[in-house]
Amino acid sequence: MDFVAKNLTKLRETNPLVQNITNYVVMNSTANSLLALGASPVMAHAMDELEEMVSIASALVVNIGTLDEYWIPSMEKAAKIASDLKKPIILDPVGAGATKLRTKTALKILDFADISVLRGNFGEIAAVLGEHGKTRGVDSAAYDSNEAIELSKNAAKEFNTVSAVTGPVDYVSNGKEIYAISNGHPMLSKVTGTGCASTSIIGAFSAVDEPLKAAVSGLTVYGISAEMAFSEAPYPGTFQAKVYDWLYRIDEKLVFEKAKVNKFEI
């Protein structure tokens, strides 16, 4: 896909500032992933600086991984400001379906904010969509490609957004068309925060292209970087460091050689 390679170059030329309201577990790895890729991360959630920070950011990433009574209002306020300013907003509903608080928080943000991309695994996306009566329930352990395609399409339509259902194959849809991305490696599941990092990388690409292509670009680049990392470091600790290295090293030529992306009309 030509646009993935071009977006990578454009991202590095523009060095977008990506504001993350994310969880404690992944702040460091997310920031390092963005820096390695060529974006600028900022982790800012204080209520008193949100207006200033959102106004200068190129995109906002909201990740609900470690919710509490202080962070939720900050997430909601930031999403409202970003919507008013028409900034790209990427929502990662970490653990939606596991508790009522997580599901309710994700749904509230989806209901009032103009979310550009909703990125989660099958169970998380099914959970928020299930609350709207569109799915049979949450089952992230066992699903087939047709179910993932339908889920991505239905979530995009229901929430008027781009839905990225990530797994062994990533499915990204705007409700009208869908991309299947087969890049990545199972070792990603052995390192905490890799899904969260991919969400923030989508945020960086959202600063240089429309949501559908931004999501495809981010997931493709991250997936290729993971494949290359595993070829050099097949164990979790060194693999994580090598992912940073390949986010830094990946270029247009490697994207053209390694991208496994297919587009389907719905």
Curated annotation (Swiss-Prot):
Q: What is its EC number?
A: 2.7.1.50
What are the UniProt keywords, alphabetically? Answer: ATP-binding, Kinase, Magnesium, Metal-binding, Nucleotide-binding, Thiamine biosynthesis, Transferase
State if Transit peptide is listed as a keyword.
no
Catalytic reaction list: 5-(2-hydroxyethyl)-4-methylthiazole + ATP = 4-methyl-5-(2-phosphooxyethyl)-thiazole + ADP + H(+)
Q: Where does substrate bind?
A: 43, 193
Transmembrane region(s): none
- Give binding positions for ATP: 119, 166
Q: In which pathway does it act?
A: Cofactor biosynthesis; thiamine diphosphate biosynthesis; 4-methyl-5-(2-phosphoethyl)-thiazole from 5-(2-hydroxyethyl)-4-methylthiazole: step 1/1
Q: Which cofactor does it need?
A: Mg(2+)
Q: Which GO terms describe its molecular function?
A: ATP binding; hydroxyethylthiazole kinase activity; magnesium ion binding
State if Cytoplasm is listed as a keyword: no
Q: Spell out the CDD domains in the cross-references.
A: THZ_kinase
Which GO biological process categories is it annotated with? thiamine biosynthetic process; thiamine diphosphate biosynthetic process
Q: Name one Pfam family in it.
A: HK
Q: What class of enzyme is it?
A: transferase
Q: Which family does it belong to?
A: Belongs to the Thz kinase family.
Q: What protein name does the entry list?
A: Hydroxyethylthiazole kinase
Q: What is the lineage of its organism?
A: Archaea, Methanobacteriati, Methanobacteriota, Methanomada group, Methanococci
